[in-house]
Amino acid sequence: LPNSTIEGYTRVRGGWNEGEAYTVYFYAETDTPAESFGTWKGNTLMPNINEQFDSGEKTGAYLSYSTSENQKINVRVGISYISCGKAKENLKQITTWDFNKVHTQAVSEWNNILDKIEVAGNEEDKIKLYTALYHCYLQPVDKTGENPKWISTEPNFDDFYAIWDTFRATHPLFTLLTPSVQSNMIRSLIDIYRNEGYMPDARSGNDNGRVQG
């Protein structure tokens, strides 16, 4: 790897659904080559060692720089549930090192959703409404193309928490504001049923946490 990149993975388990452990891969790059690098395990630094593996003990890698006053070093990170190579590919979604441009694009994409509702009222009530709407669209999460369990051309959504509650208002809201998103969520649920035999009421970490029946 060039001296401006770090890649690796971690195994994750636990959480409310008590699902199987899953792997999260990452690929990180900086806009400035590092002067030195190394890895660490526990409290021990290992300069110039470019690989490190462990199970249970905290492990990582680092890049070191000699910076001038007020110099900024930008970092961008791609993640994947498939591989480090896929994480690197996902990183291509960010085409610039300009943080302000990335921020502006993110704001624009969120406004495409938040602008679908216009209300009159005082500022406090508007903050409550748009904060709630923002929270509605944080999950389920669209992970299409990132299913580590089976190959499918169907949409892939994760982090359903939990449909026995969200069917009352959240999913009807999706149907009104973003019907294509709601349709893709339903297709994802059907695809989960086809491959795992159960329709989840709640799902996280690519695993069913709760099912009916």
Task: Identify the meaning behind each predicted range.
Residues 1-160, 191:
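Beta-sandwich/jelly-roll carbohydrate-recognition scaffolds of carbohydrate-active enzymes
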